[in-house]
Amino acid sequence: MPDRKGDRGRHQARKRAVDLLFEAEARGITAAEVAEARNALADNGADDIAPLNPYTVTVARGVTDHAAHIDDLISAHLQGWTLDRLPAVDRAVLRVAVWELLHAVDVPEPVAVDEAVELAKQLSTDDSPGFVNGVLGQVMLVTPQIRAAAAAVQASPDSGSATP
């Protein structure tokens, strides 16, 4: 039987990652910068700030590192919408979920989608869970090919940087 407390910990970490992405977008900085600042405050003894869950930091850095690809993939699967027109919370939820679909090999795809839908229920509009589910359902159709292509590039002897 799965460790339900661990599942809850990951859920909270995802929710916090969505919060960081939302804050970062509002402030015009990256989610990784927000995460680093939060952890620096916690490390310096700020009483009211706890260190972030390591998974939250991993997600924030991952979304920051792969932002252009994640946004392109989301945009390609929006029907009748543009990324800029989406509510900011929905953008953050989708970015976390797409990062998990592409890069979190220990997270089954249905779990990433279910978690995103649950976060949309908790944090966004009544229409958002169905919308998020629909977009991620389409993204899930192409993630195996994207993961395979990324693995092939990493395995290629030519994938390293050239040295002078």
Curated annotation (Swiss-Prot):
What are the GO BP annotations of this UniProt entry?
A: DNA-templated transcription termination; transcription antitermination
Q: Which GO terms describe its molecular function?
A: RNA binding
Which Pfam families does the annotation name? NusB (PF01029)
The cross-references to InterPro entries, in alphabetical order and at most eight, read: NusB-like_sf, NusB_fam, NusB_RsmB_TIM44
UniProt keyword annotation of RNA-binding present: yes
The UniProt entry, under CDD domains, shows: Terminator_NusB
Q: Which GO terms describe its cellular component?
A: cytosol
- Record's keyword terms, sorted: RNA-binding, Transcription, Transcription antitermination, Transcription regulation
Q: Which domain of life is it from?
A: Bacteria
| Assigned protein family | Belongs to the NusB family.
Function as written in the Swiss-Prot or TrEMBL entry: Involved in transcription antitermination. Required for transcription of ribosomal RNA (rRNA) genes. Binds specifically to the boxA antiterminator sequence of the ribosomal RNA (rrn) operons.
Q: Which HAMAP family match?
A: NusB
Instruction: Name the chain's protein.
Output: Transcription antitermination protein NusB
